[in-house]
């Protein structure tokens, strides 16, 4: 099962993430958990989140990039849900062998994230990749949708279909 942990503080403003979720939602065995919908008060149900993670083979962290990082509720979710003795540390093997995909949208162009005056995309992904590896997850190459503020609808739809194809390809390889 694919579990999408979706974190967008203003989901009604995001045409890109909306289209990505619509495309992903057409696949079988996909569960979408919208953190800002489930936890508007930031009071995360750790047991429910850990149960959802336990059912998944592929975990997707989908969100807009905010200040070169994750939105605050996703960071809190990581702090609360990925606990010692469950996700890492002595006895913390619940996530071992599962895959993790970082699916991120950005307002800037892909060239904005080239090494130079701004941090490169590989550099920006390092904290998430390190978290994944620490928890025994298999890190997959990220999926990024760039220029989402200026893309026309056809471009957003095409990129959202690429996202769906990426998930479908994972399903075909891993679950035949």
Curated annotation (Swiss-Prot):
UniProt KW keywords: Cell inner membrane, Cell membrane, Flavoprotein, FMN, Membrane, NAD, Oxidoreductase
A GO molecular-function descriptor: NADH:ubiquinone reductase (non-electrogenic) activity
InterPro entries: Flavodoxin_fold, Flavoprotein-like_sf, K_H_efflux_KefF, KefG/KefF
Domain of life: Bacteria
Broad EC category: oxidoreductase
Record's subcellular location: Cell inner membrane
Membrane topology: Peripheral membrane protein
Any single Gene Ontology cellular-component annotation: plasma membrane
Residues bound to FMN: 8, 14-17, 65-68, 105-108
One BP annotation, GO: positive regulation of potassium ion transmembrane transport
Known EC number: 1.6.5.2
Transmembrane segments: none
Reactions catalysed: a quinone + NADH + H(+) = a quinol + NAD(+); a quinone + NADPH + H(+) = a quinol + NADP(+)
Cofactor requirements of the protein: FMN
Function, in words: Regulatory subunit of a potassium efflux system that confers protection against electrophiles. Required for full activity of KefC. Shows redox enzymatic activity, but this enzymatic activity is not required for activation of KefC.
Quaternary structure annotation from Swiss-Prot or TrEMBL: Homodimer. Interacts with KefC.
Family: Belongs to the NAD(P)H dehydrogenase (quinone) family. KefF subfamily.
Protein name: Glutathione-regulated potassium-efflux system ancillary protein KefF
Protein species of origin: Salmonella heidelberg (strain SL476)
């Amino acid at each position: 099962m694919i579990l999408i942990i979706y974190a967008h503080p203003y989901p009604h403003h995001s045409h890109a993430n909306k289209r990505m979720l619509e495309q992903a939602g057409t696949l079988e065995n996909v569960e979408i958990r919208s953190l800002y919908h489930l936890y508007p008060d930031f009071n995360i149900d750790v047991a429910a989140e850990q149960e959802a993670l336990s059912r998944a083979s592929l975990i997707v962290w989908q969100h807009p990039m905010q200040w070169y990082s994750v939105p605050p509720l996703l960071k809190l979710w990581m702090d609360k849900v990925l606990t010692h003795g469950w996700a890492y540390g002595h006895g913390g093997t619940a996530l071992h062998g599962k895959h993790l995909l970082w699916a991120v949208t950005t307002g800037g162009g892909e060239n904005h994230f080239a090494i130079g005056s701004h941090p490169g995309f590989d550099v920006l992904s390092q904290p998430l990749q390190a978290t994944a590896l620490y928890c025994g997850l298999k890190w997959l190459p990220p999926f990024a949708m760039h220029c989402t503020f200026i893309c026309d609808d056809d471009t957003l739809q095409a990129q959202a279909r690429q996202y769906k194809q990426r998930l479908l390809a994972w399903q075909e390889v891993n679950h035949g």
